[in-house]
Amino acid sequence: MKKPAEAKALWQKIDRGEWDIIVGTQLLLRRGPLPTMGLVGIVQADAGLSVPDFRSAERTYHTLLDAVALADPAGAGGQVILQTSLASHHAIQALAQDDESLFLSEELSHRGALGYPPSVHLIALLVSGTDGNMVRDAATAWAARLTACASPAVAGQTSERKTRPIAPLMGRPGPLIILGPAPSPVTKLRGRYRWQILVKSLERQTGIEVVRTTVKDMERTHHRRSIKFDVDVDPIEMW
């Protein structure tokens, strides 16, 4: 469909119930209220769980909830069929059992064990440029500076507040944990290579101050046109 009028005509047919079978993507769920259906089938329902983002289970669960809501109530004969190879995953189990508390408790437990929000604060760092080797080297240098600044003694000097160790969550010393560098899941975008670093901190301000100090150092030693350093505090997207 290339014209808005064509899309509008299609939605009107769906609203009037002119078709017995509707095949669509997640776009159907974004449109708003739809007439309920006797049978809803979801192909590869677990596909979103493989996205390299700590929120992937949460997003998948809510997307599937919206899809399930398209089915008539069970008492009226409504049915939902999910295709999945991860039937034991808590997002799938919570959906199958219609138990939101199951999903919440399992998700919070997993995030706490791995050191992800809401247990800790995250800062996502992105290094990009047109020269792949230069981007990799810059990301490696930034991670090394972050690691040096993340030592308990140094990090404690960057903030007037007393920092708490993150060790109870991840079994590592110090108030910060530096993950990476690693190629971004989207390794190249608009001609620019991309590497990422993830900073974890129990104290949000401590992480911000360490990153602020190191990014200034990196920008002084790298020309901005060749290498770009992006900082995303409490990121919504991880890639």
Model-derived features with residue positions:
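Substrate-gripping "pore-loop 1 plus following alpha2 helix"
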Residues: 54-63
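Accessory helical-bundle/CTD segments and flexible terminal tails appended to RecA-like ATPase motors
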Residues: 3, 9-17, 28-52, 66-154, ...
